[in-house]
A protein has these predicted regions:
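Long, intrinsically disordered, charge-dense linkers/tails
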Residues: 1-96
Length: 96
């Protein structure tokens, strides 16, 4: 599951994915809170770079970017879409 991706969200087998969750909630169903965990691909260059960074703002920015990318890859929306765009732009422009 992490052949090419830097990270992915892993859910319990009984936990519906984000699309089914939205569909069920739109139908009025109450669902327990989803608690996926972030799985990192240690062979991916971004994760290797994260591993070399000291704690601080740059580390936090890349870690948040990887978590948001994992959320998007599974069809979800990052908790702070504007923050995701800002962080992505900073990395693309080399201003992280």
């Amino acid at each position: 599951r992490l052949a090419e991706s830097a990270a992915c969200l892993v859910r319990d087998a009984s936990d519906p994915g984000p699309q089914l969750r939205r569909l069920l909630e739109a139908a009025g169903q109450k669902l327990p809170e989803s608690r996926p965990w972030l799985e990192l691909n240690p062979a991916h260059p971004l994760v290797a770079r994260l591993n070399l960074l000291p704690d601080g703002a740059t580390f936090d920015s890349l870690a948040a970017l990887l978590a948001d990318q994992a959320q998007i890859a599974e069809g979800g929306v990052p908790p702070d879409p504007a923050g995701f765009v800002r962080r992505l732009n900073e990395w693309l422009l080399g201003r992280h």
